[in-house]
Curated annotation (Swiss-Prot):
Taxonomic superkingdom: Eukaryota
Name the UniProt record assigns to this protein: Ribosome maturation protein SBDS
Species of the source: Bos taurus (Bovine)
Entry keyword set: Acetylation, Cytoplasm, Cytoskeleton, Nucleus, Phosphoprotein, Ribosome biogenesis
Record GO cellular component, one term: nucleolus
Residues with N-acetylserine modification: S2
Function according to Swiss-Prot or TrEMBL: Required for the assembly of mature ribosomes and ribosome biogenesis. Together with EFL1, triggers the GTP-dependent release of EIF6 from 60S pre-ribosomes in the cytoplasm, thereby activating ribosomes for translation competence by allowing 80S ribosome assembly and facilitating EIF6 recycling to the nucleus, where it is required for 60S rRNA processing and nuclear export. Required for normal levels of protein synthesis. May play a role in cellular stress resistance. May play a role in cellular response to DNA damage. May play a role in cell proliferation.
Family designation: Belongs to the SDO1/SBDS family.
GO biological process entries: bone marrow development; bone mineralization; cytosolic ribosome assembly; hematopoietic progenitor cell differentiation; inner cell mass cell proliferation; leukocyte chemotaxis; mitotic spindle organization; rRNA processing
Length: 250
């Protein structure tokens, strides 16, 4: 894969370049295409799957390797693997206009897919299609931010779409099983976090089936654990308040 020419040059092909400017100098690393995003999102954890070589360059396309003294001056070390990690995490990915356009289009689709998966029409309780969400995103002129995760941007899109259409995050259906002694008192504390109580069953234990906003799940879970000292249980029944067989809303 690598052809060594003079000792300070390494030739590489099919490269994604990540660049960082430091101490007035330019430093670059050579990565495999489509691997940088995986590393930054935490999906890819094996550095060797991301880097084509652990060398630090001043110019990847020309194969010019950075000098040891320049690395020490800029990074305080000549440990090239550690420097590669810094550049990989904080550097700027160099892509062609065509590649950038393709990446932004893919991110746009990914954001729309997340929104469609997480949301429903509050009146019909039915989900929207990805195509309809994409159309709505274009109508509000949503601009993809390449340095923010698709999940973060999906939340932004939901907020903006709420101003233009009937949309809300799908409710999460939960079942609580609580000790009777603490159950009634705990139910009052849970009420502000519950959207709808679908059923209550008082027997040897208090069993409640309800709908909540997914954003409240952690708070509900922690409250039950704390108040029941681990004796209560929480079960996720479904992630969407949608009946099986509902058609998607075009």
């Amino acid at each position: 894969m690598s052809i060594f020419t003079p000792t300070n040059q390494i030739r590489l092909t099919n490269v994604a370049v990540v660049r960082m400017k430091r101490a007035g100098k330019r430093f670059e690393i050579a990565c495999y295409k489509n691997k940088v995003v995986g590393w930054r999102s935490g999906v890819e954890k094996d550095l060797d799957e991301v880097l084509q070589t652990h060398s630090v360059f001043v110019n990847v396309s020309k194969g010019q390797v950075a000098k040891k003294e320049d690395l020490i001056s800029a990074f305080g070390t000549d440990d090239q693997t550690e420097i590669c990690k810094q550049i990989l995490t904080k550097g700027e990915v160099q892509v062609s206009d065509k590649e950038r356009h393709t990446q932004l289009e893919q991110m746009f689709r990914d954001i729309a897919t997340i929104v469609a998966d997480k949301c429903v029409n509050p009146e019909t309780k039915r989900p929207y299609t990805v195509i309809l969400i994409e159309r709505a995103m274009k109508d509000i002129h949503y601009s993809v931010k390449p340095n923010k995760s698709t999940k973060q941007q999906a939340l932004e899109v939901i907020k903006q779409l709420k101003e233009k259409m009937k949309i809300e995050r799908a409710h999460m259906r939960l079942r609580f099983i609580l000790p009777v002694n603490e159950g009634k008192k705990l139910k009052e504390k849970l009420k502000p976090l519950i959207k709808v109580i679908e059923s209550e069953d008082y027997g040897q234990q208090l069993e409640i089936v309800c709908l909540i906003d997914p954003g409240c799940f952690r708070e509900v879970d922690e409250l039950i654990k704390k108040e029941t000292k681990g004796k209560g249980s929480l079960e996720v029944l479904s992630l969407k308040d949608v009946e099986e067989g509902d058609e998607k809303f075009e």
